[in-house]
């Protein structure tokens, strides 16, 4: 039976400033840590990415034509404040006003994120969010944007607090490239949640029009053998690191006993301690019921086994299937040999995990208000067919269809899910994979910057028009 989605459902496309704009040092933009990190460590940079800085009118015209009625955009903090604070860059401000005006002209609602992995380099060098001064600078930047851009009706403080700490201090694939430092992981998560809570409270106290929330990446964690207590515990601990710690901070205004027991266990095994003040808890508590929505980014689930060795992670950045290893001291190891399809980058394709995660939020955090699926999509080595000027991306269509079906199930079962944003609107630059891993509805020729609708774009258009998942 064909499932349908609600009439008022948002069918969106997602982007991010650093992954789409290019123009990394144009019109007064300040540097971000990624500029230096990519120059020193990788064979690619974010220049020109998808040249969204200049070509946003083309992408928004395509959005309108293909039924995309919402777009996730992030403001590059260093375009507004090149150093993260102090002097404002008027050309950056003007750019975003023009961008939001074009969104509205094309009837594409902008959902705007204040921070998407791109802290200005000046602040990043000074400890990023491990330095509590960065919290103050972020809140000042947020307040400036709330005042300056009243045309924005949907604000998100952060994109993926979990993967930021994870990438910077656990896997070591984000600048500054530190590995297995759990103290920094949890402290980064916590400090960013304090920054989020302060910004949300400021937004509500200031009487700004519109809605505000946060986007969390929530990969579902399962025990490899549900009857093995070690596997069950490994899944619980992995869930605390990636999901429960930040969800508790968002909606409980504190960390539950189970969460803190898990954190203390991980820190006792690996070393380190967490600095949380009474004032922090008061800030989290004051904001816990003020989030208008939760954005969930979901791509995959993981299966965990007990493990008592040292930490070792091998990140698959090449798209050669089977190149991943993930084992953490005091936590567990991910088992990749499970009967579940996976992408070339070893991401497990498991739509049921999205359903389970949505219903977990509904059950454990009833003050969630509403949910948007703010990222979901399939990274693929797309094959461009020159004679047809398109990509036959049936695997992407199938991936999205499967995930939309479980979203429809979750809505039927009582979850208030209001929209879906495919990652990504057009092909963009990937943080740790460069330009080979493509996600877009629109194929981008990165040499010419021409856009070509993929088969998935036509499928998505019909979906947006009929609301039927075919």
Curated annotation (Swiss-Prot):
Catalytic machinery residues: 160, 375
Record-level GO cellular component terms: cytosol
GO biological process, alphabetically ordered: lactose catabolic process via tagatose-6-phosphate
Catalytic activity, reaction form: a 6-phospho-beta-D-galactoside + H2O = D-galactose 6-phosphate + an alcohol
GO molecular function, one term: 6-phospho-beta-galactosidase activity
Enzyme Commission number(s): 3.2.1.85
Keyword NADP: no
PROSITE patterns linked to this entry: GLYCOSYL_HYDROL_F1_1 (PS00572), GLYCOSYL_HYDROL_F1_2 (PS00653)
Pathway(s) annotated for this protein in UniProt: Carbohydrate metabolism; lactose degradation; D-galactose 6-phosphate and beta-D-glucose from lactose 6-phosphate: step 1/1
Protein keywords: Glycosidase, Hydrolase
Binding site for D-galactose 6-phosphate: 19, 116, 159-160, 297, 430-431, 437, 439
NCBIfam families named among the record's database cross-references: lacG, PRK13511.1
Recorded family membership: Belongs to the glycosyl hydrolase 1 family.
Name used for this protein in its record: 6-phospho-beta-galactosidase
